[in-house]
Design a protein with these regions (language model features):
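Alpha-helical transmembrane segments in multi-pass membrane proteins
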Residues: 11, 15-16, 20, 34, ...
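Helix-loop-helix junctions within the multi-pass membrane cores of secondary transporters/permeases
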Residues: 76-156
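Intrinsically disordered, low-complexity non-transmembrane regions of multi-pass membrane transporters
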Residues: 4-5, 51-82, 213-216
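Juxtamembrane helix-boundary/capping and inter-helix hinge elements in multi-pass membrane proteins
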Residues: 1-7, 103-109, 130-132, 186-189
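Interfacial loop-to-transmembrane junctions
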Residues: 5, 181-200
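Membrane helix-loop-helix hairpins that form the core translocation module of multi-pass transporters
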Residues: 2-60, 64
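Juxtamembrane boundary at the C-terminal end of a transmembrane helix
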Residues: 204-216
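Structural signature of hydrophobic alpha-helical transmembrane segments
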Residues: 33, 37, 104-117, 159-174, ...
Length: 216
């Protein structure tokens, strides 16, 4: 186990890097209002469905079953924080979406391989800070990536370049929230409840396109 000051520095470095990546990805948006609308609607749905609370509940149940000794700190402990932070960090990234779609559409998994390498380094840093919970996040990540790959195989004619751009931008904002709320700990942000915004982004792109056609 790394010393506390080392864990703090490594986690802060990961937070700053995540923040920078999030800003860069958001700047890829073609229409910031769509990203804003996606986040607003996604946040409403996330609060209604209690996405983050459910993720926390899963982490708490795993903690009660598997954590030992000093790692048991209740629902707000290191195990749950590690599970939630790693799940969000590894799933929210647009590289997950793009890589899974690329794999599903063309069979090329090179982008997912690159992402897995990056996730491995991030997991080492997170595990030293948050403990055993990081390991259990891999189950959700594998299911999420596999599901996206399967869906992508059927969605070739659905996701346009504009839809992918806005999904990437929204993912960037979620990475910023993750960096601020979980890694840098500047203020609490229920980033998990914003995950539905990733689905709302292509929906809003389609709606705006249809409205534009009607107004012509």
């Amino acid at each position: 186990r790394l010393p506390e000051r080392v864990r703090s520095t490594v986690t802060s470095a990961l937070g700053l890097f995540t923040l920078a990546i999030g800003v860069r990805l958001f700047l890829q948006t073609k229409n910031p209002l769509i990203a804003l609308g996606s986040l607003a609607l996604g946040g409403l749905l996330g609060e209604w469905w209690q996405v983050e609370q459910r993720l926390t509940g899963v982490g708490a149940r795993l903690e009660a079953r598997f954590a030992r000794g000093g790692e048991v700190e209740g629902a707000g402990g290191r195990f749950v924080r590690g599970f939630l932070t790693a799940t969000l960090l590894f799933e929210v990234g647009p590289m997950t979406i793009l890589g899974s779609i690329q794999d599903g559409l063309t069979g090329d998994y090179s982008l997912l391989a690159i992402k897995s390498t990056l996730d491995g380094f991030a997991a080492l840093a997170l595990a030293s800070a948050f403990g055993m919970g990081v390991m259990f996040s891999t189950v959700g990540v594998l299911a999420y990536q596999g599901g996206l790959t399967l869906i992508a195989g059927q969605a070739q004619a659905v996701l346009s370049e504009a839809m992918m751009a806005e999904m990437t931008a929204v993912g960037g904002v979620l990475l910023i929230g993750l960096a601020i709320g979980s890694l840098l700990e500047l203020r609490p942000i229920r980033t998990g409840n914003l995950l539905p915004a990733l689905v709302m982004a292509p929906v809003l792109v389609w709606v705006v396109a249809q409205v534009a056609v009607l107004l012509q």
